[in-house]
């Protein structure tokens, strides 16, 4: 359960980054988020 909480916090941080950063870095973060969501399921 602790890992799940850490993941949610990490995703929340990434979402903030996505709002600030636009361009190549945003695409990389998007891929990481997609990967995390796939693992979560």
Swiss-Prot record:
The UniProt entry, under InterPro entries, shows: Competence_ComC
Name where it's found.
Secreted
Molecular function, one GO term: pheromone activity
Keyword Secreted annotated: yes
Q: Which UniProt keywords apply?
A: Competence, Pheromone, Secreted
**Residues that make up the propeptide removed upon maturation:** 1-24
One GO CC annotation, please?
Answer: extracellular region
GO biological process entries: establishment of competence for transformation
Per the record, the coiled-coil ranges are none
State the function annotated in the UniProt record: Acts as a pheromone, induces cells to develop competence for genetic transformation.
Q: Which family does it belong to?
A: Belongs to the ComC family.
Q: What is this protein called?
A: Competence-stimulating peptide type 2
**From which organism does this entry originate?**
Streptococcus pneumoniae serotype 4 (strain ATCC BAA-334 / TIGR4)
């Amino acid at each position: 359960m602790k890992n799940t909480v850490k993941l949610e916090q990490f995703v929340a941080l990434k979402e903030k980054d996505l709002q600030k950063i636009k361009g190549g870095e945003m695409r990389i973060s998007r891929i990481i988020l997609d990967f995390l969501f796939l693992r979560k399921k």
